Amino acid sequence: MEELFKIYLKLREQDKKLLKFIPINNRIILSKINTNSNADSELKYAWINRSLAQVSKDKTSAILGLLDSDSEEQKIARRMTLKYRKGKNFPVPFEINNEDDLDKFLNIIDNNYITIKQNYPNYSNDEFLTLKKYNFKNKKIIIANSENSNKIIGSNESLQKVYEKDTIWIKLNIELFFNFFLKKNNIQMTNESFESIVFTMVKLVKSILIPSEFYKGNIDNLRKKIKESLSNNILPVLKFNDSISGYGVHYPKKINGEYNIEEIESVLEDDICFKNYLTSVFDQKENDNKFNNIVEKIEDNGIIIQKYIDGNDYAIGFFKPNQLYSQFFSLGLLDLDISEVLTNGTSHYGDILHYENDFLKSILKNTIFEKQEELFYFSIEILIYLICINEGIIKDPNEFINVEMEDFGIQFMINNKTGDLGLIEINARTPSHNFNHFNLLSIYGEEFWNSNLLASKKILCKSVKIVDIDEFNKMTTNEETENKLIEFFANKIKSFSDRFNLVSFQIIKNGFYIYYYYFFEVCNLMEETIRKFEIYMKDSILEIKNLK
C-alpha cells in the first residue's frame, strides 16, 4: 500500500504543471501554473488585479486546462485577459487534439469575445492569434460551463447523494480509482492486496457518511420525528443552513460537554414547548438576523436532522494553523500535527490534498492506520472523487487529476470511546469565478510562490456579507460603477492596513460579500478587532449610494 501512495504522489507531481484558463468574473486569465515546490518559480509577473466576481444568469464562466508548454505562444497567452459577451456558452466538453480542433476553438473565442483586454505586457490581438501556430497535437483542453465551474459541493446535498448509493457502486468506483493509478504507472499488485485496499476504503467511506434527513414542513411533525429518534437511541442534531458557504448551527447544544437528553425530552412534550425552544436557542445569536422567525424558516426552507456524535472535532483543509488560532477559521480547522499540508504555496488552489512521504509513512503501517483521524485524512480525497463522479463534474479517474477545489474544508467528529465516526461538514467549490489568492499574487508577485507566503505568514482569508444583493444591484449597474466600488473599498481598507488587506468582492445569490485577509503575526487576532473591522465595512457600504 505504501508503494501505491508513492506512485500516487509521483503522478501528482507529473500532472501538476498545467496551463490554466481561469475565470474571474467575466474575464478569463490565461496563465502558466507551476505548483512544483521543488522547482524554481517561473512566475515572473503579477496577476491582473481584478477582484469583483459576479455570478448571474446572463454571464458564464469557463475553465480550460492545457498540458504545459514553454513555447513563446504560451508565454503570450499567459499575459492575456479575454472579456466575453454576455449570454454565450462554450460547448462542453471541448477537446483539442489536432489543429482543426484548435481552429474551431479559436473561432468560438472570436464569436464570443467582443474585446481583448490587454494587460501586462500589452500584446496585440494579432499576436494572440499566433497561438494558431502552436502544434496542439495530442494536447487536450477541457472546458467546463458555468454550472459545473461554479458548483458548490455541500454536505446537505452531495454527501447525502453519495451515501444513498449502494455499496456496489461505491466499491466499483473505488476500484476504478485505484486501477487507474496502477495501470498508468505499470504497477503490479496481487489481487489480495488490491481487494484489501478497496475493502478498507469502502468501509471507511460508508462509515463516515452519517445518514441525514432533510425535513421541511410542519413543526409538530418535526417534533415527532425527533421524539421517535430518541426512542430508538439515536440522538438527533438539528442543522440549519442559511448561506451558500455551508454555515450551519447545531442544536441542541451540549452542556458541560454532554448532550442533555432530559432537556430535549422536556421540550418535546408538545408543539408549543418545542416552538418556544427553537425560538429561544436561535434568538440567542446576537446581531444576527439569519435566525429570526426560525419556525417559519423551517416550515418554508427546511432543516437537516443528523445523528449526534459525541467526540472530538477534527477538520481537514489546506491551512495548517496553530490550535490557538483555529477559532478564527470559518471552517474550524484544527492542528492535527500533520507535516506541511500546504506544500505548494497556495491556500485555495492546487490539488485537493497534499501529502508528504514522511506523513504517508506515519499513516500507513502494514496497511493499518495508526490513528482514525489520519485514516480520515487520506480517505477524503477518495470521497471527493466519488462526489465528483456522482455530480457529473468528471467522468473517470483520468479527469480527476485536473480537479481543484476552492474554499475546501471538511469537519468531522470521532467518538473517542466508541470509535464512532461522523462527517459533519464538507465545503468545496470546483474551479470557479473567484480565487482569492490571485489577488495576493497580484500584490506579492513571485514572492507569493517562492516563500510560501500563506504558510509562513499565516494569512487567513475570510468573507463577510455586507449588503443584500437587491440593494447592491440598485447601487451598481455598469463597469464604471464597478471600478468606483473597487476603488472605494480599497481606500476604506487603508485604516486597517497594518492588519487587514482587501482581497476581493464576490456577488452570490444571497448577498454581496467582501473577502479580506489578515496577518497572524501583525494582528493580535482578538475577536473584538475582527468584529470592529466587519462592522466598519458593513457601515461603509451605505456610502456607495453617493458614487453615482
Regions found by a protein language model. Give the residues of each.
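Conserved N-proximal alpha/beta basic substrate-recognition cap immediately N-terminal to
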Residues: 40-55, 65-233, 242-244, 251, ...
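Active-site nucleotide/adenylate-binding loops and adjacent lid/helix of ATP-dependent enzymes
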Residues: 179-302, 357-382
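Phosphate-binding site of ATP-dependent enzymes
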Residues: 233, 253-254, 269-342, 409, ...
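A short catalytic or substrate-binding loop motif that flags glycine-/basic-rich loops and adjacent residues
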Residues: 242-244, 308-312, 401-406, 510-511
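N-terminal leader/transition segments
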Residues: 2-41, 82, 116-119
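ATP-dependent carboxylate/phosphate-activation module, predominantly the ATP-grasp catalytic core
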Residues: 265, 318-393, 427-463
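Flexible, glycine/charged-enriched surface loops at secondary-structure junctions
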Residues: 392-410, 453-457, 544-547
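Peripheral (often C-terminal) accessory segments that flank ATP-dependent C-N-forming ligase machineries
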Residues: 445-548
